[in-house]
Amino acid sequence: MQYHSPENFSSAAYIAANAQGSVRFLAGGTDVLVQLRSEMFTPDTLIDIKKADGACCIERSADDGWRIGAAVTGAEMSEHKHLKSDWPGVVEAVDLIGSTQIQGRATLVGNLCNGSPAADSVPALVAADACIVVQSLSGERTMNVMDCLLYTSDAADELRS
């Protein structure tokens, strides 16, 4: 297995696009690390995005919404008083993801991108009309969470955040 820790999402997309075999992204790791340790699945390439620019940030977006980085944990979201005030349903949904220990590692983006039918945060994201940013070699594009759920439009080099 090849391990990469890129400095930005453009580099992560480049690594993913040029990788041979299976690729997995690592942010919180609550699912990926379990799969690795139990030998359920070992990807050919593991891309750790925790150190990518913006991966750990919670900030206001230009449209007065919120931008939540791909590696922001549920615990970090719960502790952010302004986010909690503006998006109470989303923060409450994130609080439903696992135990306190899991919330210290689990990410909102991981909960969405894993594609589990039991993803606790997804209904709240849909209700909040949330959008995601998808990164590829061609650049970034923004799409609504609902479209993300209905269509499998990701190219091989795209990374959702």
Predicted segments, located by residue:
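C-terminal structural segment of proteins
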Residues: 1-153
